């Protein structure tokens, strides 16, 4: 169940990447494809083909359940408030490692970010909090990127550092006393500091729209990888998206 829900909506987590540079207000539609391998044991690769609908304005951005609003802008800095669902979790049908465990549910996060943009450099610091009291967790993310232009092709490497508190890690990667079995010892999650590096290629030259290919590698710290539910120390996600204006 959790796997199916995530497949339907995971593309919407990227509302700001599929637009032409210089556009200030637009309704978008298009298609996207994503593939990635979860780090949970026995949790298979996800392949997603998904329609995309969204709106990008000077202050308001809406992509399905993902919403951000620019509260203020001073020089090269902007301050945003944002709402986003967190499609993490599992139930016992997603993998044999989860059999006999309680469902870990998706949640909604609310938070804010400070963004700096100058000379094709972008730096953002964001903080998101679980408001449905599923994990009562917090995530802090710092991202640094730079856009290089090669004619109509834009290349953007991106480095991210994220912090997940112990509440978040314990909920999604921990094993409670009443969930212990022969292959699944008790585990209390610890806070985790993860690192990611991604690269995206974007261009407006195809079919009158905007195309983007992005690949990201994420390395997870011991607070997550020490869990008996986890088999990998990192994963790679690849996405291909095409959008155009209504």
Can you describe what each PLM-predicted range is?
Residues 33-39, 57-59, 83-89, 118-120, ...:
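Transmembrane beta-strands of outer-membrane beta-barrel pores
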Residues 59-62, 77, 120-123, 152-155, ...:
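Repeated loop/turn-to-beta-strand initiation elements of outer-membrane beta-barrel proteins
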Residues 68-69, 131-224, 229-231, 244-246:
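Outer-membrane beta-barrel transmembrane domain signature
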Residues 51-54, 144, 233-246:
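Outer-membrane beta-barrel "beta-signal"
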Residues 37-49, 93-106, 190, 223-228:
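Surface-exposed strand-loop-strand hairpins of Gram-negative outer-membrane beta-barrel proteins
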Residues 19-67:
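Short glycine/proline- and aromatic-enriched beta-strand/turn motifs that initiate or cap beta-hairpins
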Residues 1-26, 42, 227:
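Cleavable N-terminal export/targeting peptides
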Residues 25, 45-51, 75, 104-110, ...:
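Residues that define the transmembrane beta-barrel architecture of outer-membrane proteins
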């Amino acid at each position: 169940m959790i796997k199916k829900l995530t497949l339907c909506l995971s593309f919407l987590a990227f509302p700001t990447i599929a637009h032409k540079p210089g556009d200030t207000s637009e309704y978008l539609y298009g298609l996207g494809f994503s593939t990635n391998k979860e780090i949970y044991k026995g949790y298979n690769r996800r392949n997603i083909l998904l329609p995309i609908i969204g709106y990008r304005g000077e202050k308001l951005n809406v992509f399905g359940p993902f919403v951000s609003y620019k509260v203020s802008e001073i020089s090269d800095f902007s301050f945003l408030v944002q709402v986003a669902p967190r499609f993490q979790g599992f139930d016992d049908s997603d993998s044999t490692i989860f059999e006999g465990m309680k469902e870990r549910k998706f949640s909604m996060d609310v938070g804010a970010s400070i963004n700096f943009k100058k000379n094709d450099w972008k730096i953002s610091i964001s903080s998101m909090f679980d408001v449905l009291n599923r994990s009562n967790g917090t995530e802090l993310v710092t991202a640094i990127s730079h856009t290089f232009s090669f004619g109509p092709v834009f290349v953007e490497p991106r480095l991210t550092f994220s912090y997940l508190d112990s509440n978040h890690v314990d909920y999604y990667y921990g094993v409670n006393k009443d969930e212990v079995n022969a292959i699944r010892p008790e585990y209390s999650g610890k806070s985790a500091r993860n690192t990611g590096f991604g690269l995206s290629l974007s261009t407006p030259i195809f079919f009158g729209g905007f195309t983007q290919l992005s690949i990201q590698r994420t390395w997870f710290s011991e607070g997550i990888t020490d869990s008996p539910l986890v088999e990998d120390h990192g994963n790679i996600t690849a996405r291909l998206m095409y959008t155009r204006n209504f």
